[in-house]
């Protein structure tokens, strides 16, 4: 009987797609004739929004990879990709929902975004790039801690 009273929890991927992809090689074709020592930087951003259909959410994970030559600081390439997922999420309270959107959903999207980035770099004529796994739970906990610190500092003023 206790099982019947438990709310149904559902976290399902309904659709995955590349929402945006941009590849820039500003110094082509000369860049392919130079001996370069690339320094790679990775930028990560994500956002989510509730969709019109009940319990459906859209999560966008944006990765920006910039390769600059370590000696000249000139941009070798810049790749931006937005991997998007539509998720159906049922039976979670607000705190659990935020955790699911910011951790679970981004963790699902990241391997797809990573593959899109690596493929785009290879298709642009450069050696493939392996992006390390990311602990989105740790990033989310850092974000919550920063928000708490900001709120605490705002309350002291």
From Swiss-Prot:
Name the UniProt key words of this record, in alphabetical order.
Chaperone, Cytoplasm, Protein transport, Translocation, Transport
Per the entry, what this protein does is: One of the proteins required for the normal export of preproteins out of the cell cytoplasm. It is a molecular chaperone that binds to a subset of precursor proteins, maintaining them in a translocation-competent state. It also specifically binds to its receptor SecA.
Q: Which PANTHER family match?
A: PROTEIN-EXPORT PROTEIN SECB, PTHR36918
Q: Does the keyword Chaperone apply?
A: yes
Q: How does it assemble?
A: Homotetramer, a dimer of dimers. One homotetramer interacts with 1 SecA dimer.
Query: Key word Magnesium present in the record?
Result: no
What's an example of a GO molecular-function annotation for this chain?
unfolded protein binding
Q: In which compartments does the protein localize?
A: Cytoplasm
Main subcellular localization, coarse class? cytoplasm
What taxonomic classification does the UniProt entry list for its organism? Bacteria, Pseudomonadati, Pseudomonadota, Gammaproteobacteria, Cardiobacteriales
Which processes are annotated in GO (biological process)? protein folding; protein tetramerization; protein transport
The protein's name is: Protein-export protein SecB
User: One GO CC annotation, please?
Assistant: cytoplasm
| Protein origin, superkingdom | Bacteria
